[in-house]
Structures are given as structure tokens and as C-alpha cells.
Curated annotation (Swiss-Prot):
Protein's UniProt name: Protein SlyX homolog
InterPro entries: SlyX
Protein family (similarity comment): Belongs to the SlyX family.
Organism: Thiobacillus denitrificans (strain ATCC 25259 / T1)
Pfam families: SlyX
Amino acid sequence: MSDARITELETKLIFAEDLIETLNQTVIRQQAQLDQIQQQLRLLHRQLQDALAREAPAPGNEPPPHY
């Protein structure tokens, strides 16, 4: 294999390794964002359930329907 071909392959390898590292860091950052969004969603869901429970009339205490 010629020196030029080896140099070309080494250059491509360096760029590929850099791209892989960049993509890996992007995935790590996006996973952290996803974890944060999921935590916020769980909190909002819990708050919604609490609010609905406070507003719902107790069974048997519902006003009669009006016709």
C-alpha cells in the first residue's frame, strides 16, 4: 500500500473518530434533556391528578341532574 493511500486512510479515520465523538456527545446531551423532560412530565401529571382529585365531587354528594 502506498504512503499516500495510508495517509488518506489515516485522515479518514481521524475524521470518522471525531464524528463519532461529536455524535456521542450529542446523544449524551439529548439523553439528559430527555430525562429532564420526563421528570417534568411526571411532575405535571402528578399535579394534574392532584388538581382533578380536589375538584371532583365526592360520590354521593353530586347534585341531582337538572332536566
